[in-house]
């Protein structure tokens, strides 16, 4: 009986998503003109997942399953704990690289500093670390936290922005969701946006130009129905200090680049809006296995991931249908890369594409120089990265 109910719920969820007929999509272009900046904020990572990896100039930072921060270089094969403490053996929680009292699986690299969130007296704080791991500085308080990975960060200019991406999604209790702005210069804290309701989450916060962009998502569940939808796309202007709505469409994720706004509407597909000429076209249609997609862009190709969709429809699709779809900016499919063994779809920068496998510290990659024909994932680490108690 339980199995039948689950299948019915899944089918209703699928039908509700795909009942969205292709619409005359409306975008508020006035507030998104001239939105491009250099992508120092690393918006190419999956903003709707864990952040256990961050790109640096030559290599990458990674949070291991033991909650140690390490730096690795794919070209040399080197992996080192991020700690410069004299005489430290990097094998206990006194090591600077140990993040076991922090918001888990969240690490960021921005303007030559590492950022993470230690929990002090039940409160997640924003902390900045230099690249070597020798010095740290607490910049300010963010949100109450039990250590789960739901608190995320985004960066724009001289500010970090913190938000809870899912702690209250699916709950029956009313909560107020907030975006908190923290100055990277003096730690000044401001709440720039809030929304109150039941089963809400702020998602996919990214900085482009003067604007901080984000979604607000809502879910409902009853005995007969599961519904997950977006209230649209919003933008907070740093200069004007206000929030405007860019679109009311059911947008799951988006990306801005080269005067274009790319966005995935649930039940329809990937759209491309020309900001200058204010024209919109559907460049990739959703289908039974590819919907609710997240988006990444590396300056050459767009990448869409159906990982979240497969997770929601696990009983129907499961991991076997998980994939990255590589397309050019006109919608031509360049490659479809299976992620059947993936636990997390991470995307990547202009050098490599990443995902997390099912095994311990099974971080996998593909070289983007060969992305047009890439098929096989390679492991970063030959074995789990065990440092504790060595």
Specify the residue positions occupied by each region the protein language model found.
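Hydrophobic membrane-insertion alpha-helices, especially the h-region
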Residues: 2-13
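Surface-exposed loop/turn elements that mediate protein-protein interactions on large endomembrane-trafficking
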Residues: 18-46, 68-93, 122-143, 170-195, ...
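Acidic/polar residues in short coil/turn loops that connect beta-strands
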Residues: 58, 76, 110-111, 132, ...
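Loop/turn-rich, solvent-exposed surfaces of beta-rich toroidal or solenoidal domains
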Residues: 290-317, 322
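C-terminal regulatory/effector modules of DNA-binding transcriptional regulators
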Residues: 162, 204-206, 212-214, 230-232, ...
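Surface-exposed, polar helix/loop patches in the mature regions of secreted/periplasmic/lumenal proteins
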Residues: 111, 116-119, 123-126
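Residue position within the beta-strands of beta-propeller blades
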Residues: 62-63, 115-117, 161-164, 213-216, ...
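Repeated scaffold domains used in trafficking and secretory/extracellular systems
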Residues: 46-56, 91-109, 145-157, 197-209, ...
